[in-house]
């Protein structure tokens, strides 16, 4: 009888092609997602060595990082480097015969939104991409993580990857979340507790009642930021919600293949008695709407808190806090709700899905953004955009004073025209608040979609619960 195994153990074991004496393994890769920034050198490497893509049917490409989110982008991209990278992906996709969603295709969008949306991401798979937020796909019970450009070439050529196994970490969120608290608050709160190095060397399995109660889109948000917590990947065991989400998607199994897949997927859970190397437990009811105040995702506090002082920290974090406060232009003791906001960005692979847009629109309905506020919504894919327009969400955003954009990574990172100006302060639903992440000397506060919408209305960081519609009193 085999020893109890974790979900990570099971997926890993199912994909080991060969294991060396030192523990290094050759892993088979089921899905390879590709975008325009980390792939050009990899494809050129194939050309130079006369190789083909080993499994073009398992390789999916989409431009997202560099593409503008304004009309006319399918005919002209002004930035030369961005244009060259997008054109290179277009040519490489044609030359090597891989699946491709060009800018002109309504299915185009952020690669980590397109993959699940199209049914490419399935439970039990290994999924890689030259992008750190590949962990998103772990929401399906897939082992998904980012790889470097040389590894991109290796996977293109061999459909395998050389890896050493990580350790197992469990993050359990018990109980239920309170109203106004979201998946984004969960993942930021975990990072705030463990730090950005807390998951280093581990693959995290997220579990507990609060995780089970999340939708698939919420689970993707949680797993998306596993990398910000230092982990190699994040996983959530698949369940009936997972199967319902996947069923009927363009590239999901059909007929007898679906039944066979479903039988396998139902074995993908951590066995009773399986051992984790590290365990973190948080009570769901203790999580509040949160916001980052500094320049690291671990600099996170409940919106009801005040800006900390360097003296509140120890060791090397004292100087780090001092630098963060200086860069962010904040004063210790200042209420987080007193911090003025210039710009609001709703989008990214963390929070650019239809449920994220619904949550923001619910807060914005019938309201206007604060005077002078720059606010934009960037759907995560063309299909999300179309659905939001069909549901009337787009009109709510437009009526409130938001810009309604085309799909792309947009202001999550300063690699396209959507950027902050020096000193500009943004409430953002993205995943990183590093110095210059959204533009040189730009200041980023990470929040949930509802919190971003609240800040857009009031002009400052705001507790979304103060703007939520109170439930009707029972008769």
UniProtKB/Swiss-Prot annotation:
Q: Does the keyword Iron-sulfur apply?
A: yes
This protein's cofactor list reads:
[4Fe-4S] cluster
What GO biological process term is on the record, naming one?
L-leucine biosynthetic process
- Where does this protein hold [4Fe-4S] cluster? 349, 409, 412
Recorded hits in Gene3D superfamilies, A to Z, give: Aconitase, domain 3 (3.30.499.10)
Q: How is the cofactor bound?
A: Binds 1 [4Fe-4S] cluster per subunit.
Q: Which UniProt keywords apply?
A: 4Fe-4S, Amino-acid biosynthesis, Branched-chain amino acid biosynthesis, Iron, Iron-sulfur, Leucine biosynthesis, Lyase, Metal-binding
SUPFAM superfamilies, from UniProt? Aconitase iron-sulfur domain (SSF53732)
Residues annotated as coiled-coil are none
Q: Which GO terms describe its molecular function?
A: 3-isopropylmalate dehydratase activity; 4 iron, 4 sulfur cluster binding; metal ion binding
One Pfam family in the UniProt entry: Aconitase
Q: What is its EC number?
A: 4.2.1.33
Q: Which reaction does it catalyse?
A: (2R,3S)-3-isopropylmalate = (2S)-2-isopropylmalate
Pathway connected to this protein = Amino-acid biosynthesis; L-leucine biosynthesis; L-leucine from 3-methyl-2-oxobutanoate: step 2/4
Q: Which PANTHER family match?
A: 3-ISOPROPYLMALATE DEHYDRATASE, HOMOACONITASE, MITOCHONDRIAL-RELATED
What role does it play? Catalyzes the isomerization between 2-isopropylmalate and 3-isopropylmalate, via the formation of 2-isopropylmaleate.
Q: How does it assemble?
A: Heterodimer of LeuC and LeuD.
Give the family from UniProt: Belongs to the aconitase/IPM isomerase family. LeuC type 1 subfamily.
Protein name, entry field: 3-isopropylmalate dehydratase large subunit
Species assigned in the record: Cereibacter sphaeroides (strain KD131 / KCTC 12085) (Rhodobacter sphaeroides)
Its organism's taxonomic lineage begins at: Bacteria, Pseudomonadati, Pseudomonadota, Alphaproteobacteria, Rhodobacterales
